[in-house]
Amino acid sequence: MMVKIKNIIILFCIFGLLSNVSSLSSSSSSSQSSDNNGNLSPIQDYDLEFLSKHLTTKTPYWILTKNGDSNSQGDGSSGNSNSNSNSNSNSNSNSDSSNEPPEQCKLISIDFIARHGSRMPVLNSIEKLKEMTTSILEYKEQVNQGFNWIFNYSVPYPSDIAGNLILQGQYEHYNISKRLLKKYPLFFEPMKYKPQSYSITSTAISRTGISASAFSYGLLQGTGSLGVDGFQPVFIETASLDQDILLRFFATCNQYVDQLKNGTLINKDEQTKWNQMVFPNISNEISERLGLSDIWLPTSNVISDIFEACAYEISINNISDHWCSLLSKQNILDWEYSQDLSNYWLKSYGHEINYQIATPLLNDILSGFDIYINNNNNGSSSSSSSSSSNNGDNSGSNGSSGSGSSTSTSSNDNGSTNNNDNKVEPTSILRFGHAETIIPFISLLGLYKDEQKLFANSSTEQIENRKFRTSVVSPYASNIAMFLFDCGSAADGFKILVQHNELPVLVPGCDEIYCDYQQFKSIFKQGIDNFKWNSYCNINDDDSGSSGGDSGNGNGNDSHSKKSSYFLAIFIPITFLVGGTIGGIFTYFSYEKIMQVKNRKKLTQYGNDEFISSPKSKSFSFKPTKFDSRSPLIQ
């Protein structure tokens, strides 16, 4: 009996020991899981998902879904929120039955505009990061031990690859294209690649060109004939940096550039006012966390650099326990609003010029759709009513090649006109630019527009519930896609769907997400008709140089250039002839005058010895002095 009791006690002890081991293992696993969540410090009252969704234009690409940050709603029209996904794996399409096109509608053309993917810091940012820690180095002995890594910190971003696209940025575009292909297989699969059916353009910057390559590779993977994997090479067209009015309008509109540098038209003060309000408190908090209260306070520039260093560490290496560990949740939200104020007033709704300069891009998109519709006017009874607000003028003639040129080329390479029996193939227009491309273009469409303008002294409620957030509007690889559908009947005609970051959005002025194409065009018709690139963007220029077809599409520029070419072709030869004639006459009379002076001197010095008198004439002739090639008369 005693033996049995002893055995039972031993079993209970063993069971208890195993339970403790299991508990310790579970605790260890939980602790490890917490550590894997980014080694967040106690002051980091947020998780990595929050952090990676509030880095303004340094934010990794979002996958837009219905579950996520309630403060990140778009323009208020979709009613959907967002959740983050930075995975390099292929993600499922965010389809929803309510967002499916009407059953009778067929996708016939796509125009896709995207920002480049995640990148390295640009050179200027790298230089600032190198100087960031210099003011704190002398306080090494006083800094809290948890931050000793600061004194061994070196900027991990090589200057020779500054601004380059990183692998994550390539995957962002690769995965977007895969989801697009999965969403519309019937549109893409029958369409073999050729430059006439795929117009792919980027700015003349490597990160946008490589983004275009990554997107194209995902979209066309395995469809080519090159190599064992069926690689399909593509043609990517670029325009020179100083002439690209479609994707770099922010740099080629002289009026806008001048206002940014010197003008008072664009408000630059709101961000400064906000920083003056919140940065002193952030400075005190950072100093306290470092253990340097009353010893060292980071300046406004150092604070900005710390935020930027945090953003790059998250977006490039997913590191949160270095510079981000100095920042609380409220610090990050305050910095995010600081950046939003800058982008709002310099690139968005702060002033009309910020987004009106994106008009040529919108006009080029609609012109391309119109050309496609008019060349396929057998497909819908409503197509005969479709025409561009500028009769299909193609803005691609100045700057990046546009959709109009792409679609017309597919059937007009020989210069002949299309007839109704020869339909143009479906066309994909893919464009790759920058945050400065996306933000103004989204603003031109009226998306993410707050009822009241954003100011440094806006109410807390307005700041917290604002629609305009660059973390949502323009993260890395942000995109706007326009889908043209042929719905096949006079009642429905053609419809257009606009998506921002793969989520359908309701454009203000449209009755529904699948907006009637004519209605969509009418919303922007006046703005397109009234916008003249030359008169709007060229400083001290008037409308006379851009009259005619300059409806925001660059044709006025082209027309002006042609007129200048004709003028110069006539003026230069005439000037040369007149100038040469006058020069010859001047040289001749100068020569005669010099000879006369020389002869007078000789006559005075030698009498008439140099002259030969003619017995039959009272006039005199003389032996001319040979011209010296070194004479000052011959230059």
Swiss-Prot record:
Membrane topology: Single-pass type I membrane protein
Secretion signal span: 1-23
The keyword Cell division appears for this protein: no
PROSITE patterns in UniProt: HIS_ACID_PHOSPHAT_1
GO cellular component: cytosol; membrane
Single Gene Ontology BP annotation: response to lithium ion
TM stretches of this protein: 566-586
EC code(s) of this entry: 3.1.3.62, 3.1.3.80
GO molecular function: 3-phytase activity; acid phosphatase activity; bisphosphoglycerate 3-phosphatase activity; inositol phosphate phosphatase activity; inositol-hexakisphosphate phosphatase activity
InterPro entries: Acid_Pase_AS, His_Pase_clade-2, His_PPase_superfam
Cytoplasmic side: 587-635
Domain of life per record: Eukaryota
Name listed for the protein in its UniProt record: Multiple inositol polyphosphate phosphatase 1
Job description of the protein: Probable multiple inositol polyphosphate phosphatase that hydrolyzes 1D-myo-inositol 1,3,4,5,6-pentakisphosphate (InsP5[2OH]) and 1D-myo-inositol hexakisphosphate (InsP6) to a range of less phosphorylated inositol phosphates. This regulates the availability of these various small molecule second messengers and metal chelators which control many aspects of cell physiology. May have a dual substrate specificity, and function as a 2,3-bisphosphoglycerate 3-phosphatase hydrolyzing 2,3-bisphosphoglycerate to 2-phosphoglycerate.
Catalytic activity as recorded in UniProt: 1D-myo-inositol hexakisphosphate + H2O = 1D-myo-inositol 1,2,4,5,6-pentakisphosphate + phosphate; 1D-myo-inositol 1,2,4,5,6-pentakisphosphate + H2O = 1D-myo-inositol 1,2,5,6-tetrakisphosphate + phosphate; 1D-myo-inositol 1,2,5,6-tetrakisphosphate + H2O = 1D-myo-inositol 1,2,6-trisphosphate + phosphate; 1D-myo-inositol 1,2,6-trisphosphate + H2O = 1D-myo-inositol 1,2-bisphosphate + phosphate
Keywords, alphabetical: Hydrolase, Membrane, Signal, Transmembrane, Transmembrane helix
Bias kind Low complexity: ranges: 67-99, 380-421, 614-624
All ranges on the Extracellular side of the membrane: 24-565
Family: Belongs to the histidine acid phosphatase family. MINPP1 subfamily.
Active site positions: H116
CDD domains: HP_HAP_like (cd07061)
Ranges for region Disordered: 66-102, 380-425, 614-635
Gene name of the record: mipp1
Main location: membrane
Compartments reported by the entry: Membrane
